[in-house]
Amino acid sequence: GITWAAGGAILLAAWGWVITTKDKHQVNLIDRAEEKIVFGLNKAKGNTVFRGGALAPTKKASQRLVLPGILIGCKVSEYVDSWNRSFALVEHPNNTAAVVIRLTPAGSNLVDQETVDIQVAYWGQWIGDLSNESGITGASITIESLPDPGGRLNREVTSRRAANCPQVAGEVIEGVLDESTGSNQVRVWVTLAFNLAALGGRKNKEIAGREIASRLPGLTQGLVAAGGGATHLVTVNELARLVRSAYDPDSEELFDQALAAGQTINLDWPQSGPVFAQADFSSYRHDGAVSRVWTMTCPPRGAVQSAVLSRLLEPNRDVQRKRVTILYQPMDAAKAPSVVERDLNHARANAVGARPSARSINELAAASEVASEEASGAGLVDFAMIITATTTPDHLEDTSVTVNALSAASRLLIRPAYGAQDSGFALGLPLGLHPVNASVKARP
């Protein structure tokens, strides 16, 4: 009996050690084992490999290139808002829909700090007000940096250049075009996710579509005040090109060349998916490229300045294509007080002691301020971050080192989405998917 009791005590102690021992990402051995087991089961079932178009393993092969994984089943329709602007409405199988808005922010260069502070305040207010918007379940902002083929600048200059311009002016223009070769471009989108049932669209989605269309002018005006620049509602054709170039980066240059030649690109939504995609445990291969996805496990701590993410968001010559998506989800007003109170009590417990650290004192002050603002009527918003880097297989590890360094410079703690690279890739696209409502309905 004593031997069995001693053995049981040892097993309990070992089990407690396994559960309580966590790494810097707060992941224990059980969590890591679960990641590998779940991924292994999906791989054995063939769920980690996707083939589209004529290569699709279906009874009737087709030329359709549907989206893989958790994006299967999403549909796109086009509506017109109150300002007569066409926009794409992305409908997901879980009765949610999303609108994608293209922004043109000017950046922080040559902008005084007072203006930056005002824009940050407006952005915070815009995000906070989403909790008061009926039917909005979440929002996201996506910042993508990628090589610029140069066609956009060439088209803009050519269309504005006078035929009889002076020789000196012509040489300056040609110099600008030459210098743009090999440069980068930055694209920004904001995506709004809606609950169609809350907008009266469970049975009739046209009603929900018209309701969304009537509210877009006010929502986009708030983005302009927050420094978003001119706003543009993304159309179906533009959204299809956006998704297609994410899965097949080489198509970006083909689209640019077609536009430079004055051709019209007619890419339908069923043609926006990849021909081939394969999810590995720590990477995602798709149409000749490979991506790695990270998720944020700890946000910047302490005082957070407006430029804290600048190193991560700006283009980097060592990362061919980088996409950073911040997901926002308004918290239920009935749940917010208890969450704030719990955080405040936790901060107080950490600050109690003979010699509390400076960090714990600052965290207590921040928690107290949040509690005061929430009591005054401010809304709370949960947020997460997904980072996607796309490159060639030979440069994947070097790119990963650079992304980790950029994240550390931005005071972020990130971890690869082990066993969920394909889902992380889809969540990082500006299509309105959020982790709490994303699910796989079917596979082709």
Language model region names:
Residues 4-444:
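Extended, folded cores of ATP/NTP-driven motor/assembly subunits in large transport
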